[in-house]
């Protein structure tokens, strides 16, 4: 293994206003498995991703709704109807997606009880790069970095 390299995402931590509400949301929506719960913190396993929550009741949360910042999880195209139904049945706040070209692939956007945004996306970075290279040649592409990314994921 090479030294001095980022190895991947270690964990995702969210500030939440009500720990018990967030625990219920992530268990029901994502089928996340809780590992440890305390008075103001909880750790979950989400299919190998370490999720952490810290309850912070007095944080202003209104501004988060104006941002496009989000976390996207990959899903299969054929699973899109399942997720649409599940989110609807659970009463999850599903957000209006942005207009997109079919080359961007399909997505569902939604938020948790504190306004953290998520996307369930059917494409990959490789799909997006191919679409951009074919349809948006005016963009700048770093061919060396793109090749290295492809090579790492063969």
UniProtKB/Swiss-Prot annotation:
The task this protein performs is described as:
Metallothiol transferase which confers resistance to fosfomycin by catalyzing the addition of a thiol cofactor to fosfomycin. L-cysteine is probably the physiological thiol donor.
Q: Which organism is it from?
A: Bacillus licheniformis (strain ATCC 14580 / DSM 13 / JCM 2505 / CCUG 7422 / NBRC 12200 / NCIMB 9375 / NCTC 10341 / NRRL NRS-1264 / Gibson 46)
- Name of the protein this chain belongs to: Metallothiol transferase FosB
> What family does the database annotate?
Belongs to the fosfomycin resistance protein family. FosB subfamily.
Matches recorded under NCBIfam families: PRK04101.1
Q: What Gene Ontology molecular-function terms does this entry list?
A: magnesium ion binding; transferase activity, transferring alkyl or aryl (other than methyl) groups
Q: The organism sits in which domain of life?
A: Bacteria
* Quaternary structure and interacting proteins, as annotated: Homodimer.
The catalytic residues are 119
Annotated ranges, domain VOC: 8-123
- Biological process GO terms, please? response to antibiotic
Q: Which cofactor does it need?
A: Mg(2+)
Q: Where does Mg(2+) bind?
A: 11, 70, 119
């Amino acid at each position: 293994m090479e030294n001095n390299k980022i190895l991947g995402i270690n964990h995702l931590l969210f500030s939440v206003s009500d720990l018990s509400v967030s625990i219920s949301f992530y268990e029901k929506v994502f089928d996340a498995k809780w590992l440890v719960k305390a008075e103001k913190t909880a750790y979950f396993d989400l299919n190998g991703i370490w999720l952490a929550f810290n309850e912070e009741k007095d944080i202003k949360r209104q501004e988060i709704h104006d941002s496009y910042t989000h976390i996207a999880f990959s899903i299969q195209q054929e699973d899109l109807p399942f997720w649409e139904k599940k989110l609807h049945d659970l009463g999850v706040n599903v957000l209006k997606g942005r207009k997109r070209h079919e080359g961007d692939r399909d997505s569902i956007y939604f938020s948790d009880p504190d306004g953290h945004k998520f996307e369930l996306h059917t494409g990959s970075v490789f799909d997006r790069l191919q679409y951009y290279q074919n349809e948006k040649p005016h963009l700048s592409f770093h061919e060396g970095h793109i090749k290295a990314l492809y090579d790492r994921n063969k």
